[in-house]
Amino acid sequence: MKRKLFIDTGHSAKYQGANGEVEWVRKIAEKLYPLLDTTYWDVVKVPDVYPGENSASTSLIKRIRWINDNGDANDMLVSIHANSAANVNARGVETCYYSGSDKSKEEALR
């Protein structure tokens, strides 16, 4: 059985994150989908609009709830962001994982 790979574009249209972030990450996601190996993964796009969304944290909670309702512990989430920083020289990648699971850490380190 294939694992699900949830792709989330980070913010909703209502709560867009950094200036221009929502448009940028959607373009990245659209370029990413055809590159993913569907031999091992069922690729699932996470919806970005939920009824009753009234804050960025509500949006995140509803996204996580949707993913949990549509997946299981063997699945993976990639949430794409284009964060900003006060320091114009800041560069890099950030990976977050569930610290209560050695398996999550192993996956994040791959």
Feature names for model-found ranges:
Residues 18:
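Extracytoplasmic/periplasm-facing segments of secreted or lipoprotein envelope proteins
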Residues 2-5, 13-15, 23-110:
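Active-site-proximal helix/loop segments of hydrolytic enzymes
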